[in-house]
Amino acid sequence: MSASHFREQLALCITLAVLAAASGDYRANMFLNGQYQNGIKDQKENNLLVNPSTNVFLNHAIISRQASPFQGPTYLPPKEFLKCAPGQQCVRSGQCLNGYFAQQLPKIQNCDPETTVCCTYRPPPTTTTTTTTSVPVANCAYDSDCVTPDNCRNGEISAINYVKKQGPNRCPAPNICCRIPSTTLTEDGYIFNLPEKTFPLPTKPAVLAMPSTQAPFRPQPTTAVPASRPTIEYLPPSTTQHPSYEKVQTSRRPVYLPPSPATESASSLIPKIRPRPEPRPQPTRRPTNEYLPPAAANEIPRFEPDRAPQPSNQKPIYRGEDQLSPQIFPTPQPANVPKHFAKCASALVCTSENFCNAIGVLSETPVELSPMEAAFRVPLTDCLQTENGSPGKCCRDPNYVDPWPVNLAGVCATRNKRTKPTGVKDLDANFAEIPWQAMILRESSKTLICGGAIIGDQFVLSSASCVNGLPVTDIRVKAGEWELGSTNEPLPFQLTGVKTVDVHPDYDPSTNSHDLAIIRLERRLEFASHIQPICISDEDPKDSEQCFTSGWGKQALSIHEEGALMHVTDTLPQARSECSADSSSVCSATKFDSCQFDVGSALACGSGSSVRLKGIFAGENSCGEGQTVRFAKPDIKWINTAFAENNKPLLLKRF
């Protein structure tokens, strides 16, 4: 047998031996021969699928030990830990009360279920001591108030809209006390801040002030004659007449009080027993050029021994007990003269005194004034109330508006051709070009019925055919309108109700004679550049004058056409026969379509500041260009009467 063959046989035997040994190990291993799996299925109480809570790892170890012939160390599974939810941590069982613990502990998330549990941390309640720092509070004086430092300049309140508020004058920091101005306007009027004592008086009477550089005046005694009793009164120097001085029981003259011995030297003490001075011979005065200044008002003249006392104009003083009192007769009472009551001005209203505040303005409710306000109240004029005939006071009406403002006083409205925005068509007027144009509306139907002319802040002149028969409460007047249905105009319009409507007494609906009506407004108009009154003239239009009329047109008023602009057209005077007019009307032909203008609008003639109202649009013959229109002439006498009844000045007619 060769060596190579022997090696092959030996390798084959070794291979078979290895395979036999491996087969024996397979049959003996429970994990490879299926005994482990079959044992788990046979013990259902330890099966994880049947009873998941059983510790299957320990049983697996026992089965594995029984299946193996070797006795090795028993297999133990890893210890189970509890994983806490977010916000919890592991603590001992005794430290967790009702699911919370309050002690600071290390944060552990995996808990040993035998000794620890998951618990939520809740900090213990802490008692915080609140310390409040007291804010400094100052008490302001009676003439000061508490304001911010920005509103105080040089020690005085400088706020423009400052109003004195009633209440305690306590001023917390950082505010400061600042002096109130001399007068402060409040809702009740002016409050005058005066010192409590304008002229403070001394609490105890004292001697007159004497200069500190000279000794007090004392007469030079010559003969010591004891008086009957001690006196401490001041004795004036002797005069040439030598009147006897007696004690006068009066408290009006200041009484001399000697100084205390502790504060003044012994040489300046006044003896208690003052001798009566003896008259001295009068030496002849020699002329001298020496200037002697006059004594001050509160100064006692200096006594000079070498100067003789001068004659005095002072009258001798006598005792009051020795004099008879003069007979006093009572002042005779004047005869009962009837009190004159004045008539209040146009801006004032006669009302009860308790309805006037401290500055004389009418109040809707009774006013109670303090003693200080009543002492410095604005003087009021006596008047007689027309309602009940009782006395009253003239008080200013806060709602009064002057009929002619300052910028319009005595000035008639003018035609403004250079205003903007401008019209679109040739017959369109610019904004505020015709400032006296008004519009008459009916409230119940919300319709536009006609036009009008503003002749005062509370009066509009229109056509009687337009407003005759309508309820006063159903009429509204709009001033300052230009574009219908628009609110984007440079200045707003003004809408007000109507108080009365006065139709001309000679108005005839059949002939349209005196087709005029005066509308009195409930509220006064506020004049502006687009709202102004026109002056009136009763003269007929002339051929040389430039006349024109205005309005929005019949169609625009009937349908309230949105965006319709005010129209204006020139007119030419015509004969009265062209429009069948009488003496109360005039006729004029329009350049543009006569139906593009409104009944009640003004026929204005002139230019610049001489524009006058000479007619009110009463009606047209037909629509079209060049058609004749009838205008009612203004009756100035009747209009002035209506103005006079309402206490208005007669300023309508201009010459």
Curated annotation (Swiss-Prot):
Q: Where is this protein primarily located?
A: secreted
* Gene3D superfamilies, alphabetized: Trypsin-like serine proteases
UniProt record, GO biological process:
dorsal closure; dorsal closure, elongation of leading edge cells; establishment or maintenance of epithelial cell apical/basal polarity; germ-band shortening; imaginal disc morphogenesis; imaginal disc-derived male genitalia morphogenesis; innate immune response; notum morphogenesis
Region entry CLIP, spans: 343-407
Instruction: Describe the location of the Peptidase S1 domain by residue ranges.
Output: 421-644
Q: Where is the signal peptide?
A: 1-24
Q: From the Swiss-Prot or TrEMBL record, state where the protein is found.
A: Secreted
Give the matching SMART domains.
Answer: Tryp_SPc (SM00020)
CC per GO annotation: cytoplasm; extracellular region; extracellular space
**Disulfide-bond pairs as recorded:** C344-C394, C350-C383, C356-C395, C450-C466, C547-C605, C579-C587, C595-C623
Secreted found in the keyword field? yes
Give yes or no: UniProt keyword Phosphoprotein. Answer: no
From start to end residue, where is composition biased (Polar residues)?
213-225, 237-252
* Keywords assigned by UniProt, alphabetized: Developmental protein, Disulfide bond, Secreted, Serine protease homolog, Signal
Entry note about domains:
The CLIP domain consists of 37-55 residues which are 'knitted' together usually by 3 conserved disulfide bonds forming a clip-like compact structure.
Q: What does this protein do?
A: Inactive serine protease that plays a role in germ-band retraction and dorsal closure morphogenesis in embryogenesis; contributes to amnioserosa attachment and epithelial apico-basal polarity by regulating the localization of laminin LanA on the apical side of the amnioserosa epithelium. Contributes to epithelial morphogenesis probably by regulating the bsk/JNK pathway, as part of a negative-feedback loop, and by modulating the cross-talk between the Egfr, bsk/JNK and dpp signal transduction pathways.
**UniProt similarity note:** Belongs to the peptidase S1 family.
What name is this protein filed under? Inactive serine protease scarface
Q: Report the source organism.
A: Drosophila melanogaster (Fruit fly)
**Gene name in the database record:** scaf
